[in-house]
Amino acid sequence: TPLARNNLMKKFGLIGYPISHSLSPALFKAAYNGKYIYDLIEIEDFETAYQKFLDEYAVINVTAPFKGSAFQKADIVSEDCKAIGATNILMKREDGKIVAGNSDHLGVSGAIADNITPEMSISKVALIVGCGGAAKAAAYATCKDGYSTVIINRNFGKAQEFAESLKNLGGFDAKAEPMSEFSRYFREAGVIVYTLPLHIPALDQLSEEDIKGVPSAAKILLEANYKDPSFSKEDIEELRKINPGLVYVHGKEWLLHQAVGAYK
């Protein structure tokens, strides 16, 4: 999409709150090699942050908690964005229209693919924990990659609504389950994407059988939160003692893959 040929081309940034911990500026500044500015726009109010984008920036990345609000502002949305119902990229076209894209799902697909080896026997069930913007992108990614996708969220209605939209929009194999089914699907899943900012009590109630899994031992556990993960090193060590085939994938891998997608 052609951008306005003026000084706005030189200025990029990130909106969200809080974002002082974000690694995005370092990643994008390295990629741009000093040619463009990349700012953290750390404003708690979405409308104020969005106005700053309109006034000063050509393209912005969007992170929590603004992905849904930013999506609502777009004049044109990509197919991926439409399916996810959230955006992590907003850009201005030369005619002034705002275009929304989403590279979060590329982050999920890339991080999972990087950690699956040919000899791994892995269940084609994916468990997505949460139903915010990151979880929606994760569910879309696993659906596109051929996984039977189960979304579990504290607000069951929200998860059910999104699962239905995935089925209707893309004919995907997606469903929602209540939190009471967490241990069952942790056991059945080959891929688990954990997007909640907190360590939920259901994690502490997993049995050894749940962690070992069926029908095969290999599991990919991808966590969205790279700054303050819900799984400590000790947690991962405990899980791996029970299931040596469990691979924990840090949120930084997700971030890196989505940043590459956003940069492109």
Give the ranges of each region predicted by the language model.
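Short, conserved loop/helix-junction motifs that constitute active-site signature segments
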Residues: N6, M120-I122, C143, L206-K219, ...
